[in-house]
From Swiss-Prot:
UniProt cross-references to NCBIfam families, sorted A to Z: DKMTPPase-SF, HAD-SF-IB
EC number(s) reported in the record: 3.1.3.87
Protein name: 2-hydroxy-3-keto-5-methylthiopentenyl-1-phosphate phosphatase
Pathway of action: Amino-acid biosynthesis; L-methionine biosynthesis via salvage pathway; L-methionine from S-methyl-5-thio-alpha-D-ribose 1-phosphate: step 4/6
GO biological process terms on file: L-methionine salvage from methylthioadenosine; L-serine biosynthetic process
GO molecular function, one term: 2-hydroxy-3-keto-5-methylthiopentenyl-1-phosphate phosphatase activity
Family recorded in the similarity comment: Belongs to the HAD-like hydrolase superfamily. MtnX family.
Protein purpose: Dephosphorylates 2-hydroxy-3-keto-5-methylthiopentenyl-1-phosphate (HK-MTPenyl-1-P) yielding 1,2-dihydroxy-3-keto-5-methylthiopentene (DHK-MTPene).
Protein keywords: Amino-acid biosynthesis, Hydrolase, Methionine biosynthesis
Enzyme type, top EC level: hydrolase
Xref: Gene3D superfamilies: 3.90.1470.20, HAD superfamily/HAD-like
Catalyzed chemical reaction(s): 2-hydroxy-5-methylsulfanyl-3-oxopent-1-enyl phosphate + H2O = 1,2-dihydroxy-5-(methylsulfanyl)pent-1-en-3-one + phosphate
Length: 228
């Protein structure tokens, strides 16, 4: 089978969750209430995220972007992992519930990638508005999993073919539905807890050097073979 990588961004490629960092810096009290409602699942991730960014004025655009450029830290080994995928013609997709205005500039120097699927920011009004161009597909409508904004399982169904060996890399609860579709899950933090609770097998990682070692072993044992 041909390997294909679906990798989360916030808390996975970066050391911390950039949205949480951003909200804590600019609108801590207001965003905390929304975050609590999201964790308690009284509002959807999509509605919560929209409400958070609506707290920010578009006049803060440059300040917000600069803050994230200054504070976001790329996880150790990411460049080596991406280069390995590129050298072995392994499709590498970033699939994130984050937003284009900070994801794209942060990963630009590591590309090109096969694709970046994320939410988009509209700065044309007074407040920042999010546009969700990767919402849930018809398959998600069969279950109570809608409202996730950028729907990772829907992206996987759109991109992956039957011959692909799907590698999902993530850290949070928002990665779990994608993890259930994976042939192998590389997990850290909250995703590990959810995988253990619901008996989904995974391999833990701390840095992308760990991910690289796991993928190399898969290639060497023919669980996943290069496309060339």
């Amino acid at each position: 089978m041909k390997p294909i990588i679906f990798c989360d961004f916030d808390g996975t490629i970066t050391e911390t969750d950039n949205i949480f960092s951003l909200m804590t810096e600019f609108v801590p009290q207001e965003s905390e209430k929304i975050a609590k409602a999201m964790m308690e699942q009284t509002i959807s991730f999509k509605d919560g995220l929209s409400a958070m960014f609506h707290l920010l004025s578009t006049e803060q655009k440059d300040e917000v972007i600069q803050y994230l450029m200054d504070t976001a830290v790329i996880r150790e080994g990411f460049e080596d992992f991406v280069r390995y995928a590129q050298n072995h013609d392994i499709p590498f997709y970033i699939v994130s519930g984050g937003v284009d205005f900070f994801i794209e500039p942060l990963v630009e120097k590591y590309g090109p990638f096969s694709g970046i699927y994320c939410n988009k920011a509209d700065f044309s009004g007074e407040q920042i508005k999010l546009i969700y161009s990767n919402s849930c597909d018809e398959e998600c409508a069969k279950y109570s999993t809608q409202g996730c904004g950028c729907c990772k399982p829907s992206v996987m169904r759109k991109v992956a073919k039957e011959e692909h060996f799907k590698i999902v890399i993530g850290d949070s609860l928002s990665d779990f539905e994608a993890a259930k579709q994976a042939d192998i899950v590389l997990a850290r933090d909250h995703l590990i807890q959810r995988c253990e609770e619901l008996h989904v097998s995974y391999k833990p990682f701390i840095t992308f050097h760990d991910c690289l070692k796991i993928v190399q072993e898969l290639m060497e044992t023919n669980h996943a073979v290069p496309t060339t």
